[in-house]
Design a protein with these regions (language model features):
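N-terminal secretory signal peptides that target proteins for export/translocation
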Residues: 1-22
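Bacterial N-terminal signal peptides
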Residues: 24-36
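N-terminal mature-domain "stem" immediately C-terminal to a signal peptide or N-terminal signal-anchor/transmembrane
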Residues: 53-98
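Flexible, low-complexity segments enriched for small/polar residues
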Residues: 62, 66-69, 108, 146, ...
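Active-site substrate-binding loop specific to GH73 endo-beta-N-acetylglucosaminidase modules
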Residues: 81-84, 93, 104-105, 116-124, ...
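Amphipathic interfacial helices
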Residues: 118-119, 129-137
Length: 628
């Protein structure tokens, strides 16, 4: 049973109510996600596909924004209901990316000594306030598929390089997946992370490193086994899964990823564009191929007995590029062209593989909507991916507007959703949800100054207060413990989830310890600016905080309205139970407990304690933790 109790619970008079709140609620996260018995009863407006132009209620708008952004706000709910789903998505796709590296470079130009902490503060600030919410949310999802991490000796101090990779993901979140794969393959930071940076062709003593070749196949594209468009397994005559590649295929791919390193600057100066013999290079531009170190042999890709002939690709041998031909000669140009064209052919072969559509569609659905999408849901999205030649914008649109994603009826058993629908909210998404719901702003800044690039003189840095979130939450933006992310898409929590053969990825980082550390950290984040049980506010200088204007006038003197609005902003109308205004004993479920706490356990003079205490209680509750 998930019953997190904060170690800080006695620092205010409401703290003693928290344990009772959680205990009385008594909801198992596992069962609420995995064992719902509801039948799939679509709302009438979805009977023949997605037909509703606009959300019918604020709650439906808030639920959509929970999936499509880092959390709904009062303004974003109103905007979505005004323009409708399609226009909202179109507007988000058209909104330019909020970038990280140029902003931090502007801070560095003022003499600030930067680190990964500044990158994290910028990430959290963008998640909480940036206008390109869908783009940033999809980029976050992609960062958990195309994993790069600062938890690596080569990148731990490279805040600028990791920021550049974040910008690659956000800038290309709605473009071609094939183009994004190429940018990832040529990222110097990815090259260092998965060791194809300065990877050399075979010699008498060495062979090409195979790390990136293996991961671009297993994790970034086709996966380990063949799948149908609906993500179901394709099996052989003995009923066994069929592998998509073997060691021989990895070896062939590894030979392609040789000769790539940091590009020469422009102008090249002393940098040799053919051999790369220099210490002068561009740290952020896509890696360039240096033909002297690129493998020139012929290569056979996907050459497995199980691979359909259409997927087999043979790359011819290259020209005589070693020793280096005369500078500027036709042969030198042929060598450059061979190296670059071979990479293009390989990326195209990967992107065109039929396994990419169901693999990527399934993972993006998991990150945005539900851990266990139906076969039909995956196939519908995969068909859009394939028909659009891997257009991520079209794919994300299909994910969000699919009938399975949009079906939700708070009054129906299981919300009228398919059996086993939903997912555990990722820890970072829990934080951004309550930050956005109540307009959190960073320390040291009034808000708008941080949107200028370069920042005006006198602006120092964004202070959101989460420099090491992996300690409390087991999650850190672009800081996974390995290339397999914080959790794996096919993780099955032991017990009822595994017995039902369901997936529960986010549960891989939830345990007794993180439940408590997360609850404690959320307390500190919600109560930022208050100390020692006092309701006197002191402006934080190192942490995000809720402006008093957001808290002091929030349904002042109207506890019923407060419960309803909290239910809307944080839980899109999904809060269980009911309450009877003015009657503390008649309530049921989470609504009843919360109303009783606000109406009967606190005085009207405790407005800040009411609002902040309620936000904290909801943020650590099992019902909030499950996204439905």
């Amino acid at each position: 049973m998930f019953t997190p109790i904060s170690a800080h619970e006695n620092t205010t008079s409401s703290g003693g109510c928290m344990a009772a709140f959680i205990a009385k609620l008594g909801v198992s996260l596992t069962l609420s996600l995995a064992l719902t018995g509801a039948s799939y009863a679509q709302d009438a407006i979805f009977a023949d596909g997605f037909e509703a132009a606009v959300p019918a209620t604020d709650a439906l708008a808030a639920r959509f924004l929970t999936q499509a952004s880092f959390g709904p706000t009062k303004a974003s709910i109103a905007n979505l209901r005004s323009v409708g789903y399609e226009a909202w998505i179109n507007n988000q796709i058209a909104t330019p990316a909020t970038l990280t590296r140029p902003y931090l470079a502007g801070l560095g130009a003022q003499g600030l000594s930067l680190s990964q902490r500044h990158r994290l503060d910028r990430w959290f600030h963008s998640a909480a306030t940036a206008p390109d919410q869908l783009r940033q949310r999809v980029a976050f999802a992609l960062s958990e598929i195309l994993v790069l991490s600062d938890n690596n000796d080569a990148l731990i101090n490279d805040w600028a390089g990791v920021s550049e990779y974040q910008d690659i993901l956000s800038s290309n979140a709605f473009g071609s997946y094939r183009d994004l794969l190429k940018k990832v393959a040529l990222s110097p930071q990815m090259g260092k992370y998965l060791s194809h940076w300065r990877n050399r062709k075979s010699s008498a003593t060495t062979e090409p490193d195979e790390n990136f070749a293996r991961e671009i196949l297993q994790l970034f594209s086709i996966g380990l086994v063949w799948r149908n468009p609906d993500y179901s397994l394709i099996t052989d005559a003995q009923g066994q899964a069929i592998p998509t590649y073997d060691q021989g295929v990895v070896t062939e791919f590894a030979q392609v990823f040789t000769g790539f390193a940091n590009a020469c600057p422009s102008p090249a100066g002393l940098c040799n564009r053919y051999s790369g013999l220099t210490s002068i290079f561009d740290s952020f531009a896509p890696m360039a191929c240096f033909p002297l170190f690129h493998d020139l042999s012929s290569k056979q890709l996907f050459d497995l007995d199980s691979s359909p002939a259409v997927n087999r690709v043979i790359l011819p041998a290259g020209p005589a590029c070693d020793p280096a031909p005369a500078a500027g000669s036709a042969l030198e140009q042929q060598c450059f062209a061979y190296c670059n064209n071979e990479l293009d052919s390989v990326i195209t072969a990967i992107a065109n593989h039929p396994n990419v559509a169901p693999m990527l569609s399934h993972q993006l659905i998991q990150r945005l909507v539900t851990a266990n999408p139906s076969a039909g849901y995956v196939q519908r999205v995969a068909s859009i991916y394939s028909a659009s030649s891997g257009d991520l914008g079209a794919t994300v649109r299909a994910i969000l507007l699919d009938p399975e994603a949009r079906t939700f009826d708070p009054s129906a058993p299981g919300f009228g959703q398919p059996p086993n629908f939903g997912k555990l909210r990722e820890p970072l998404l829990r934080i951004t949800a309550f930050w956005r719901a109540f307009g959190a702003v960073p320390g040291l800044c009034s808000g708008t100054c941080l949107d200028q690039n370069p920042p005006p003189a006198g602006v120092t840095e964004v202070r959101m207060g989460l420099g090491s979130p992996q300690i409390e939450f087991s999650q850190r933006p672009l800081g996974a413990p390995s290339v397999f992310n914080f959790f794996e898409p096919d993780f099955q929590q032991p017990g009822p989830v595994a017995a039902a053969n369901l997936f529960s990825p986010e549960f891989q980082i939830l345990d007794e310890t993180t439940s408590v550390t997360a609850a404690n950290s959320i307390w500190d984040l919600v109560w930022s600016g208050y100390h020692g049980g006092s309701l006197v506010f002191t402006l934080p200088t190192r942490n995000a905080y809720f402006p008093n204007s957001e808290i002091d006038n929030f349904f002042l003197g109207n506890n019923a309205g407060m419960v309803d609005e909290l239910n809307l902003r944080l839980m899109y109308g999904s809060m269980s139970g009911s309450y009877t205004a003015g009657n503390c004993a008649a309530g049921t479920g989470m609504k009843g407990v919360l109303y009783n706490l606000l109406q009967c356990q606190m005085s009207a003079a405790e407005q800040r304690r009411k609002v902040l205490g309620a936000i904290h209680l909801i943020a650590i509750s099992p019902e909030f933790s499950i996204q439905r």
